[in-house]
Amino acid sequence: MKRLVVAALLTLLGAAASAQPGSVMGVWLTANGKAQVRLAPCDSPASGPVCGTIVGLINPTGPNGQASAPDQAVDHNNPDPNLRGRKIIGMPLIWGFQRTSDPNAFDGGHIYNGENGKVYTANISLQSDGTLRLRGYVGSPMFGETQIWTRIQ
């Protein structure tokens, strides 16, 4: 019984540590409320200091607009026919950022928009209220869209 309590405490401490409230690292709900994205250090240094992977979907739809089970949803809008069958959960969404002088702001990265199959240049930064500001754009940040993501973990 004592081991079970210790194991439960270690699990809770690990979950709390992974959220890192003073960091962009953690799990975020996208602005449209359709996806949960885990921001974490990239597996490869060539991919930058922070990468994002889709870890959850809320009410996904298939290519015909009909409801799809989250674990069955695929990247049907991808311009590469070879990637249209890949599962959305587990799919890389954000990569290629460079650090800025602010430890919680990253510039010059990329974000994949699964709704239209396009990749945009992006900047991300942790805001003072704990939300994540993401700006996706083509060419110049002046010509883009800003989204505010909410931390889940």
Regions found by a protein language model. Name each.
Residues 14-16:
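N-terminal signal peptide c-region/cleavage motif recognized by signal peptidases
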Residues 43, 126, 138:
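A short beta-strand motif that forms part of the nucleic acid-binding face
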Residues 2-9:
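Sec-dependent signal peptide recognition
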Residues 121-126, 131-132:
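C-terminal terminal-subdomain/extension
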